[in-house]
A protein has these predicted regions:
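ATP/NTP phosphate-donor binding region
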Residues: 1-98
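C-terminal charged capping/lid subdomain of soluble metabolic enzymes
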Residues: 2, 184-186, 286-355
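Solvent-exposed alpha-helices and their adjacent loops that cap or buttress functional pockets
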Residues: 7, 33, 93-95, 118-120, ...
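A glycine/threonine-rich phosphate-anchoring loop and its flanking beta-alpha core
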Residues: 16, 114-206
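Residue-level signal for inorganic ion chemistry
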Residues: 18, 40, 78, 129, ...
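Non-catalytic interfacial helical region
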Residues: 86-103, 112-127
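Short glycine/serine/threonine-rich phosphate/pyrophosphate-binding segments
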Residues: 107-114, 135, 251
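Active-site segments that bind and position negatively charged phosphate/pyrophosphate groups
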Residues: 199-312
Length: 355
């Protein structure tokens, strides 16, 4: 078992990494929260894979448990689904000293976090992420966003969980595409923060190799994320370094209407990382040869490095980013593998990174 502590004063918590964690999660939840009632919020498919195991573990620890299943879709990150969950909690009778558990990926994590922050004016919740992408990213840091009719990610808050429980073995049940999707996010962290993490991907020759070192990949990623959450809890300053590849990647996702079947978050981030690094190397901002190393790793993970979307369309989308202030933006780049930095660029300069 590995524990990584996030020091946020009264909102501090641990990330616990352990294979087979779900089997003794009940005792851990009981010890941490003292709750006698719990509601698991999960999604189609995950309920069958892990839901009943978690219910049994909680109930064996004396915790009365209800499981609420939401559709496995990006469209579930909505106020209508949140309202449905509120109703299910009221019907169940979850008290204010109960606990919510998010069992799933980013969508379930956002729904659960939002409900926890608002139900009974705030109750405890625990993140139990089941995808690599959520294990090393969205489940850590308390950032919660929902979509509304007017647009994506326009409603949200920061509300820290009481703990994040990660079982690396869950990755074995992921389709290959979604395993690689999460690995793309890990490569990103290696690029800007951890050379040795990046080198794990250079040395891996197969998915079996990756799965063997996955606990180490997750540990390194969570350590990085924990550090940046501590020094920049709301992601306004230093934590922006972790947006490496996201500026262009986010534009690609928006242009594709966040359709996972067209492009995943990890795939879009991979393209973003490659394009900014290629341009930065041409400008002398990044050590020569870095782009080719990144390209090798991305291709070994079957992640793309190019997009069919016209550069002018991407540039126009990026110019409208919420991170653009007075025509400028802090762009995350690499000096070399494992060493990232933020560079202020104008909207006009930013457009050149997608050409």
């Amino acid at each position: 078992m590995e524990k990584i502590h996030i020091n946020l004063g009264k909102d501090s918590y641990d990330i616990v990494i352990d294979s087979g964690l779900i089997r003794h999660a009940g005792d851990a939840v009981s010890s941490l929260t003292g709750a006698h009632d719990a509601a698991i919020i999960t999604e189609d498919g995950i309920d069958r894979l892990y839901g009943m195991d978690l219910v049994k573990s909680l109930e064996s620890a004396g915790i009365h448990t209800q499981m609420i299943v939401v559709p496995s879709s990006e469209k579930s990150r909505s106020l209508s689904i949140v309202n449905r969950v509120y109703g299910a909690l009221v019907d169940f009778g979850l008290p204010s000293d109960g606990v919510l558990i998010a069992l799933g990926g980013r969508v379930v994590g956002d729904i659960t976090g939002f409900v926890a922050a608002t139900y009974h004016r705030g109750i405890a919740y625990i993140q139990f992420p089941t995808s690599v992408l959520s294990q090393i990213g969205s489940a850590i840091g308390g950032k919660i966003t929902l979509d509304i009719t007017a647009g994506k990610n326009l409603v949200g808050t920061f509300y820290q969980p009481r703990a994040v429980y990660i079982d690396p073995g869950m990755a074995k049940t992921l389709p290959r595409k979604y395993l690689h999707n999460g690995m793309g996010e890990a490569v990103k962290l290696g690029c800007v923060c951890d050379k040795e993490l990046f080198e794990l991907f250079e040395k891996a020759n197969s998915d079996m190799d990756l799965l063997r070192v996955l606990p180490e990949i997750i540990r390194r990623c969570c350590t990085i994320k924990a550090h940046y959450v501590e020094i920049d809890p709301t992601g306004k300053k230093e934590r922006r370094l972790l947006d490496f590849g996201h500026t262009i990647g986010g534009a690609i996702e928006r242009c594709c209407r966040y359709d996972d079947k067209t492009i995943t978050h990890g795939e879009a981030t991979a393209i973003g990382m490659y394009l900014v690094t290629k341009r930065a190397e041409l400008l002398g901002l990044t050590t020569r040869g870095t782009t080719s190393r990144l390209e090798y790793v991305l291709k070994s993970l079957s992640l793309p490095t190019e997009t069919h979307i016209a550069p002018e369309i991407l540039a126009a989308d990026m110019a409208r980013s919420k991170h653009v202030k007075e025509g400028k933006l802090q762009l995350a780049l690499m000096k070399e593998i494992g060493q990232g930095f933020l560079k202020e660029v104008t909207v006009e300069e930013l457009a050149k990174y997608v050409k």
